[in-house]
């Protein structure tokens, strides 16, 4: 027997064909969300407050300090928040200290700081009753970047940019004349020496002393001449910079100094963030820049005078490691003192080394390092600016290297915690201005923190972020895999990111640093391709937001691959050689071959085993979760694998799902971490279990109660239903499944079913990827799903009186009211179809001035005789089903409703959808198709043992698409079904060809895995042997019921008076320019005329046509369409005297748009008006009679 058994949870064993020993379990798959939010609550929020506070008033007599904060218990539970359309949030209280510096008085007070949304255990937020996800954003990291560009003459020039987290950019560039310029905040360029002089190094000699003598420096110094002898060089430089930044304003050295300090050296205006400081220190540090360079002067220990490195030594990694402590210390440190007129007058500490130029052995080049400022320094320093200029000048000498912006060492992830912190910071900085003003205006004696703090800017910023940010998304809840993928999504779009239109091919492309960090397969097709990515299965964020991936360390001395795990970011990995996970190992852990496949800086090739530093932990670390669920992924073309990964996320949860016979072993972990199942929080024993709740008694005697969700509506309108897995007496451990979620079976992801599939054509019905299906799949509810739709109706106060929910609806027969209760609300369990009343509601109508008799009637009979119109909630077009639940919210019951709303009724309708012709189905290999025919079981081809086939697919769909994985799955699936086992074939480490055929043989199948099929209609065998097996097929969310649409009478656009478009608006089908040509070509003038008039925007024509059709009269001639009138007005507005004449040369009056339109009515629907008018006339006649009778009766009674 090939393979070995692996236990997944307590309910499933699979035969696994993997050969690689996994040394590291998958991390929790939603930790990117939960860890980030936890870090935000633990210290991120505190850091934001400490960034903005303390705040002083303008005279510096008062100061407001931050002390601490406390988050209390949430107001609602999760379930209550969902039901009441509320947010799951907790009140936050912040303690402030107000210090009066004149009197020394201190007031400490706790201030309510609004409700803050709290993340659920599943990594989601509940905002206004809807479950949302904050998608992590992929952005360019702050730091310093160098690039090269070739001009039209083929000359290479360089550029560099310092990009902060927030603040002004500082750029350097060289031109064709080898002069180096700098730009501050994208303004006009100035020679870079001007900025050096402004930093306090004004003399030409000083500049040559710092940077050394190079052509770029010399040319720039010559260009930067002293124009105004009245000013010192520093003052002149400052004024020149001020003129660039504030053109047209009077320039003084002092104003320029304060402007530059504000732009670059004020922590409130300029922030590199921890990550920016880390990246700058890493790039400008001398250790990385000296690597593999030849030193030109001996390196001497400043304390002892000992020569550490002789001149002419090549600085290999080992040499640098031997003097690392000296490099981090005072070795070659030089302190420069700027002159008194400088922007920053503190001494500038640099590290200066001289090396031999790589391009010319006779030249010496100066390398300046920024001497590693402390990590706490969040602004750029003069030392950073000088070191950046030095790196820039070194590039022209062949030292250093330019950066690749798409390298994942230069792109980082902003997860939910950081995105929230930025929003709070934004709100606090708006609040700061407000606080400062109130401190200055009000009387110091009576001020308290509560009085000067207005929390509205902060709560508004947070609310806006959750409600309308591009990164706050309605959770994709089709199935647990789509939830999980959504939580792990990385988007390059959003505020501060890229835009679709401006993103080129390079940004979207797969980069070698994606390996183990971002999935190269799973990304949307269409305009977002490559901009929206997914975290790889082992991917993990470090404290700076860079994605790390785990590797097994190789002991270089012994050659043993250890079980020690090291997490590396992309730029750390560039320094090493990494072997692939499927490299063969001996028993003692050494490599079995002398040469192994590995990679170093993106070069994939064979490397000697003795130079390998690390080895991958698992073959599936390359791909994301959804991709890792595709068996035989290694046999599929990547384009089709992309579709397969994406389509699994669109699978509809079925009534009784089956886990795949051929899985990858990923199904268990994906289901476990998705948040859709119920997982035991503690060890214990089950004491009670039914469909609604499970009770587990812990060992310490306390009781855990787990509530099971039954048929809740998911965000996607599918049924979110959980099924209990345990029974009384079961012992459960922490992390065990207590209940399956939707699309799960026995603790594994189960998106579809395992039908018997044959690759054969049948009567041409599977042309173009269509799917032929057996009626058994319909009858046995194999592909049946439940869909829940929510409808709501609310009663409001109107000018004419309140609306009311009632059973007494005008002009509605008793038959339509049969399922309504005495309030007028549908009963639970009622079967409804389109047009049925769900909630009876009437709205008062406007009345004319009443006559004396009518007033008398009102006085006698109350409001019964008032005119009302029917505004009931009805089942919309194309919907039907069974009423699953009704929820009623009223102010009387203490429910929070919007202002003006008195009552809200929600009706949930469940719809059972069997699979039908027109539904879309797919396998896991991108093999998708639409059901074209459902054939009776008896007509389907059958196997020699009489088993009919369930599905027939077109064999022509395989070769050109190159997704051969489906054929492998087919054969292995049949073997698994015959043997009664489940199989795991992990990606890149699955069943080999030998495993496949030995399993086929074990199952007793024919050696070619094909079989003879017999025609169900005739009983004759088909000519050729056919590949028949079991393939995992899923039903996708694109169902024909949601797409079918027809319009008879419907709404029109207010402006153009043409029918609206789309199913949601109950719109018509667009008859475009080309379709008009087609009718013109056939000379179908009458058809064309009615399409362009009655059916479109001839307002009077369509009214008359409607009337004529209802009364059975001939349809009158059409009039002038509205769009023609618009054209005439357009030409008239251009000054052309254009009029329309009839055959007698009389001018035709075109009605004005305002005529016949009620100003209050935004949505004009003339046909509805005509209907209503007819109904009103009939009703008025009927009511006049009734009123007469009533008067007579009243008179009689008197």
From Swiss-Prot:
GO terms for molecular function: DNA binding; DNA-directed RNA polymerase activity; ribonucleoside binding. One of its GO terms (biological process) is DNA-templated transcription. Keywords: DNA-directed RNA polymerase, Nucleotidyltransferase, Transcription, Transferase. It catalyses: RNA(n) + a ribonucleoside 5'-triphosphate = RNA(n+1) + diphosphate. Pfam families: RNA_pol_Rpb2_1, RNA_pol_Rpb2_2, RNA_pol_Rpb2_3, RNA_pol_Rpb2_45, RNA_pol_Rpb2_6, RNA_pol_Rpb2_7. InterPro entries: DNA-dir_RNA_pol_bsu_ext_1_sf, DNA-dir_RNA_pol_bsu_external_1, DNA-dir_RNA_pol_su2, DNA-dir_RNAP_su2_dom, DNA-dir_RNAP_su2_hyb_sf, RNA_pol_bsu_bac, RNA_pol_bsu_CS, RNA_pol_bsu_protrusion. Residues 1174-1198 are annotated as: Disordered. Residues 1174-1192 have a biased composition (Basic and acidic residues). PROSITE patterns: RNA_POL_BETA. It is an enzyme of class 2 (transferase). Its EC number is 2.7.7.6. One of its GO terms (cellular component) is DNA-directed RNA polymerase complex. SUPFAM superfamilies: beta and beta-prime subunits of DNA dependent RNA-polymerase. DNA-dependent RNA polymerase catalyzes the transcription of DNA into RNA using the four ribonucleoside triphosphates as substrates. Belongs to the RNA polymerase beta chain family. The RNAP catalytic core consists of 2 alpha, 1 beta, 1 beta' and 1 omega subunit. When a sigma factor is associated with the core the holoenzyme is formed, which can initiate transcription. This is DNA-directed RNA polymerase subunit beta. The lineage of its organism: Bacteria, Bacillati, Bacillota, Bacilli, Lactobacillales.
């Amino acid at each position: 027997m090939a393979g070995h058994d692996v236990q997944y949870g307590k309910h499933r064993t699979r035969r696994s064909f993997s050969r690689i020993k996994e040394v590291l379990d998958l991390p929790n798959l939603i930790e990117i969300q939960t860890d980030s939010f936890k870090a935000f609550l633990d210290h991120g929020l505190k850091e934001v407050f400490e960034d903005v506070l303390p705040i002083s008033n303008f005279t510096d007599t008062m100061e407001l300090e931050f002390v601490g904060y406390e988050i209390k218990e949430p107001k609602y539970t999760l379930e209550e928040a969902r039901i009441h359309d509320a947010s799951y949030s907790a009140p936050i209280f912040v303690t402030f200290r107000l210090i009066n510096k004149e009197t020394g008085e201190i007031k400490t007070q706790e201030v309510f700081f609004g409700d803050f949304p709290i993340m659920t255990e599943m990594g989601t937020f509940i905002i206004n009753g809807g479950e949302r996800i904050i998608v992590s954003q992929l952005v360019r990291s702050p730091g310093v970047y160098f690039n090269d560009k070739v001009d039209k003459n083929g000359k290479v020039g360089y550029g560099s940019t310092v990009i902060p987290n927030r603040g002004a950019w500082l750029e350097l560039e060289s031109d064709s004349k080898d002069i180096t310029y700098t730009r501050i905040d994208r303004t006009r360029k100035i020679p870079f020496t001007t900025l050096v002089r402004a930093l306090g190094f004004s003399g030409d000699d000083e500049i040559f002393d710092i940077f050394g003598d190079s052509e770029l420096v010399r040319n720039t110094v010559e260009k930067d001449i002293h124009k105004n002898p009245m000013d010192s060089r520093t003052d002149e430089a400052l004024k020149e910079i001020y003129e660039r930044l504030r053109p047209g304003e009077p320039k003084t050295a002092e104003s320029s100094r304060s402007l530059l300090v504000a732009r670059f050296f004020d922590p409130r205006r300029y922030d590199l963030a921890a990550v920016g400081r880390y990246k700058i220190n890493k790039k400008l540090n001398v250790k990385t820049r000296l690597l593999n360079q030849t030193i030109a002067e001996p390196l001497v220990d400043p304390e002892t005078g000992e020569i550490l490195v002789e001149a002419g030594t090549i600085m290999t990694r080992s040499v640098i490691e031997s003097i690392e402590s000296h490099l981090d210390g005072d070795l070659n440190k030089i302190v420069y003192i700027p002159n008194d007129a400088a922007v920053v007058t503190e001494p500038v500490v640099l590290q200066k080394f001289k090396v031999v130029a790589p391009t010319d052995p006779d030249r010496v080049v100066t390398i300046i390092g920024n001497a590693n400022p402390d990590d706490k320094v969040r602004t750029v320093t003069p030392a950073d600016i000088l070191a950046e200029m030095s790196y820039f000048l070194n590039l022209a000498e062949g030292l250093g290297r330019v950066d690749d912006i798409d390298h994942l060492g230069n792109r980082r992830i902003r997860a939910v915690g950081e995105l929230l912190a930025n929003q709070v910071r934004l709100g606090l900085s708006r609040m700061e201005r407000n606080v400062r003003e109130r401190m200055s205006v009000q009387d110091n004696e009576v001020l308290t923190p509560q009085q000067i703090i207005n929390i509205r800017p902060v709560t508004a910023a947070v609310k806006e972020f959750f409600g309308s940010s591009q990164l706050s998304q309605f959770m994709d809840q089709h199935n647990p895999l789509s939830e999980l993928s959504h939580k792990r999504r990385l988007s390059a779009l959003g505020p501060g990111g890229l835009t679709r239109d401006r993103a080129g091919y390079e940004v979207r492309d797969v980069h070698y640093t994606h390996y183990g960090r971002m999935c190269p397969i799973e990304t949307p097709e269409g305009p977002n391709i490559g901009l929206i990515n997914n975290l790889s299965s082992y991917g993990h964020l470090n404290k700076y937001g860079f994605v790390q991936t785990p590797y097994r360390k190789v002991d270089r001395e012994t050659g043993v691959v250890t079980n020690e795990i090291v997490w590396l970011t992309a730029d750390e990995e560039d320094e090493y050689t990494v072997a692939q996970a499927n490299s063969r190992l001996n028993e003692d852990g050494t490599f079995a071959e002398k040469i192994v496949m590995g990679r170093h800086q993106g070069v994939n090739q064979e490397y000697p085993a003795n130079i390998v530093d690390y080895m991958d932990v698992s073959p599936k670390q390359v791909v994301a979760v959804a991709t890792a669920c595709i068996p035989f992924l290694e046999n599929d073309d990547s384009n089709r694998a992309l579709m397969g990964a994406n389509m699994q996320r669109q699978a509809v949860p079925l009534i009784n799902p089956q886990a795949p016979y051929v899985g990858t072993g990923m199904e268990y972990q994906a289901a476990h971490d998705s948040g859709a199942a119920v997982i035991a929080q503690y060890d214990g024993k089950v004491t009670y279990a039914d469909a609604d709740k499970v009770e587990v008694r812990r060992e310490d005697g306390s009781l855990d109660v787990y509530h099971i969700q039954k048929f809740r509506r998911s965000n996607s309108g599918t049924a979110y239903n959980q099924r209990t897995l345990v029974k009384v007496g079961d012992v459960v451990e922490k992390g065990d499944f207590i209940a399956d979620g939707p699309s799960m079976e026995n603790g594994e992801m189960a998106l579809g079913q395992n039908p018997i599939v044959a690759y054969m054509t049948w009567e041409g019905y599977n042309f173009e990827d269509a799917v032929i299906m057996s009626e058994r799949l319909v009858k046995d509810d194999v592909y049946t799903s439940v869909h829940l739709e929510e409808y709501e109706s609310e009663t409001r106060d109107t000018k004419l009186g309140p609306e009311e929910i009632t059973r007494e609806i005008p002009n509605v027969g008793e038959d339509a009211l049969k399922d309504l209760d005495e309030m007028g609300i549908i009963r639970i369990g009622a079967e409804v179809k389109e047009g049925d009343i769900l909630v009876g509601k009437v709205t008062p109508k406007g009345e004319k001035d009443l006559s004396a008799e009518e007033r008398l009637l009102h006085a006698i009979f109350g409001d019964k005789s008032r005119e009302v119109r029917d505004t009931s909630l009805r089942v919309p077009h194309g919907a039907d089903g069974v009423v699953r639940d009704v929820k009623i919210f009223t102010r009387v019951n203490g429910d929070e409703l919007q202002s003006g709303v008195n009552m809200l009724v929600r009706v949930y309708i469940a719809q059972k959808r069997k699979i039908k012709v027109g539904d879309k189905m797919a396998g896991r290999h991108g093999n998708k198709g639409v059901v074209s025919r459902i054939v009776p079981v008896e007509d389907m081809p059958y196997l020699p043992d009489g088993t009919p086939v369930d599905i027939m697919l077109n064999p022509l769909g395989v070769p050109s698409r190159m997704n051969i994985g489906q054929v492998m799955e087919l054969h292995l699936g049949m073997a698994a079904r015959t043997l009664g086992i489940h199989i795991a074939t992990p990606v890149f480490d699955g069943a080999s060809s030998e495993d496949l055929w030995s399993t086929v043989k074990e199952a007793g199948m024919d050696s070619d895995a094909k079989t003879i099929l017999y025609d169900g209609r005739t009983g004759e065998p088909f000519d050729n042997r056919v590949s028949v097996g079991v393939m995992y097929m899923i039903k996708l969310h694109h169902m024909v019921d949601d797409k079918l649409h027809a319009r008879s009478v419907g709404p029109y656009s207010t402006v153009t008076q043409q029918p609206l478009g789309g199913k949601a608006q109950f719109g018509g089908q667009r008859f475009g320019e080309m379709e008009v040509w087609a009718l013109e070509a056939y000379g179908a003038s009458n058809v064309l005329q009615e399409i362009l008039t009655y059916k479109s925007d001839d307002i009077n024509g369509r009214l008359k046509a409607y009337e004529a059709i209802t009364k059975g009269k001939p349809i009158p001639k059409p009039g002038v369409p509205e769009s023609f009138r618009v054209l005439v007005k357009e030409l008239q507005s251009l000054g052309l005297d254009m009029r329309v004449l009839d055959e007698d040369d009389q001018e035709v009056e075109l009605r004005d748009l305002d005529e016949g339109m009620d100003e209050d009515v935004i949505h004009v629907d003339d046909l509805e008006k005509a209907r209503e008018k007819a109904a009103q006339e009939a009703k008025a006649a009927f009511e006049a009679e009734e009123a007469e009778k009533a008067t007579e009766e009243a008179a009689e009674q008197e």
